[in-house]
Curated annotation (Swiss-Prot):
GO terms for biological process: mycotoxin biosynthetic process. Belongs to the cytochrome P450 family. Keywords: Glycoprotein, Heme, Iron, Membrane, Metal-binding, Monooxygenase, Oxidoreductase, Transmembrane, Transmembrane helix. The chain crosses the membrane at residues 19-39. Pathway: Secondary metabolite biosynthesis. It is found in: Membrane. It is a single-pass membrane protein. GO terms for cellular component: membrane. Pfam families: p450. One of its GO terms (molecular function) is heme binding. Its main location: membrane. It comes from the Eukaryota. This is Cytochrome P450 monooxygenase ptmP. The gene is ptmP.
Length: 446
């Protein structure tokens, strides 16, 4: 019994001691809050915080220890975060300790680089000089482009009758609606109203801008078509789907092809220097004169088309073809554009990447934008892609400047061409592959 009483008393003493420690700690916290003023210099910089005490201790208590434990805290921080910044807590504020080590920023993804370039070039033509350099516009339009294709990719495997329902709950689809409203209210709406006010003012000095937005405004025949919301939606749809995304993907494919087949790089640079030595005097004729580059674009597209199928149509009435095949109304038809362009009966050495193949052919249908029964990646006939001419000029202009002024390479772990991604029959370049890019020098190889 005496032993049991002794054990109970010991346990009671331990509990009292622990409670005393807790009370002392709470008193210190309270004292810190009462005595110490609010830190003058506080920062929300997202860097690691180095503490003398554990992370569960309130900041104010840690600040009390800085005067006596600063050396320990600073050295501990340096040991953990030698190559980057970290934060320490002082009584009067926060200190962000910077590193003197030179850190390299992560290499960009080629798709992101070209997406921004195409968006900026396209904006100059589509909405004029007012907005084409505006960073907020570029970000909003690029995000809108990305969300369109994320939404399309996510909805493709969904049955048609469920797509409207699923589309309403997709985060990318909801973001599209917010971005459209933001772009309309922040950029295009005010720009459209400003142009209409200037036009109706009767000012003889006012000249209509010569850009795509103005063409759409002039061609709008009904009040609904001319409403800023509808103009904005149509403009974004056309630029995002017909120009920005597809051109950025094609340029990414081309860059990957050049990285795994570098023997074609110098001939392209030589042609650029010969045809267009002065970038600032570039004309449409100069870009048309880049025959080797035009052939390279077409050969890259032959190996990496936007899709294996093209020439999509829906039969509007019962139809019997010349071979007797009956197509009832509503039948969805298409052509196997990908396999046709890799068919040995159509193309000599179809599995060999010959960058200047189409320069040698020198036929009317050899051009990048030409269409025919052996080249249907832009469609065929009356309804072939109307924006392919503009896209070709944009791609040649960007590629000319890029190849002339920059060297580029894969990361050390990337030896082969990144595998394309397949979304149904659609072919998309790997958009997550980092590319090291730097300004060209004549004496130092990359």
């Amino acid at each position: 019994m005496t032993v049991m009483v002794s054990q109970i008393e010991s346990i009671g003493q331990i509990v009292r001691d622990e409670v005393t420690v807790i009370w002392i700690l709470m008193a210190l916290v309270l004292l810190a809050y009462l005595i110490l003023p609010n830190p003058t210099y506080r920062t929300n910089v997202k860097v690691p915080t180095v503490r003398y005490l554990g992370g569960w201790i309130p900041d104010q208590v840690d600040r009390l220890f800085f005067n006596t434990k600063a050396t320990s805290v600073i050295y501990d921080g340096y040991k953990q975060y030698k190559k980057k910044a970290y934060k320490v807590l002082k009584a009067d504020g926060d200190l962000v300790v910077l590193s003197t080590r030179k850190s390299s920023s992560p290499p960009p993804h080629s798709y992101e680089v070209f997406l921004r370039l195409v968006a900026r070039v396209g904006a100059r033509v589509f909405i004029g000089e007012t907005l084409c350099r505006d960073e907020q516009w570029l970000k909003a339009s690029i995000d809108y482009t990305k969300n369109i294709f994320v939404t399309i990719a996510l909805l493709r495997p969904v049955p048609g009758f469920l797509q409207p329902l699923v589309g309403r709950v997709l985060p990318s689809s909801r973001s599209l609606n917010h971005q459209l409203a933001y772009i309309k209210n922040k950029f295009l709406g005010p720009l459209i109203e400003q142009r209409r006010e200037m036009e109706s003012s009767g000012d003889s000095k006012y000249e209509k801008p010569d850009d795509f937005l103005q063409w759409m405004m002039d061609l709008a025949k009904t009040e609904q078509e001319s409403h800023p919301h509808n103009l904005a939606q149509r403009l974004l749809g056309i630029t995002s789907m017909a120009v920005v995304h597809t051109s950025a993907m094609s340029l990414t494919h081309i860059l990957y092809d050049l990285l795994v087949m570098p023997q074609w790089l110098q001939p392209l640079r030589d042609e650029i220097q010969e045809v267009n030595p002065d970038w600032h005097s570039t004309t449409q004729a100069h870009l048309i004169g880049l025959k080797g580059m035009d052939s390279f674009l077409k050969e890259s597209q032959r190996f990496n088309p936007p899709g294996e199928l093209s020439f999509h149509r829906v039969v509007k009435h019962d139809l019997t073809l010349s071979d007797g095949l009956f197509l009832p109304k509503g039948t969805h038809i298409c052509m196997a554009a990908g396999p046709i362009s890799r068919d040995a009966d159509v193309m000599s050495d179809p599995d060999v990447f010959d960058a200047f193949r189409f320069v040698k052919e020198n036929r009317p249908t050899s051009g990048f934008v030409s269409t025919g029964v052996t080249n249907m990646h832009f469609g065929l006939g009356r309804y072939a892609c109307p924006g392919r001419f503009f896209a070709a000029f944009v791609m040649k202009a960007i590629l000319s400047r890029f190849l002339t002024n920059y060297d580029f390479r894969f990361g050390p772990d990337q030896k082969d061409r990144p595998k394309n991604m397949m979304i149904g029959d659609k072919i998309v370049p790997n958009v997550s592959t980092p590319i090291f890019i730097r300004k060209r020098t004549t004496s130092q190889p990359l």
